[in-house]
């Protein structure tokens, strides 16, 4: 593998750049200065930039937070997140109102986009896992530790509830 010290060493070798978010562009709170600078250099050289991420967020949510991290929203052609892919799958798979499913949604209530993830999905969202036909796990409940999920997961296992994560 070739190590580079600056994006300028390879900028003329490619037209398109796929960039991961977490740990490459930012740490969740601050954008890395070298990443901001590199993206600005790529933009000034008319390169096509794409973000790819295993984030549970939808693509729009990821794009909307870029300015807070020091990046320009319009620097990127597209953003693909695992959260967006799951949302698209659920949207397509559960269109039928006749067989509307009960969904137990796990999300961090303190995040800006927890409830927004539900928009456009055709489910009855329920408060108890016992009532669910499926579980949508986006981000952990902020006040729970991993061990606190055991009772919930036992119910899901015993009822053979499908979980999307």
Language model feature labels by segment:
Residues 1-165:
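HAD-like aspartate-dependent phosphatase fold
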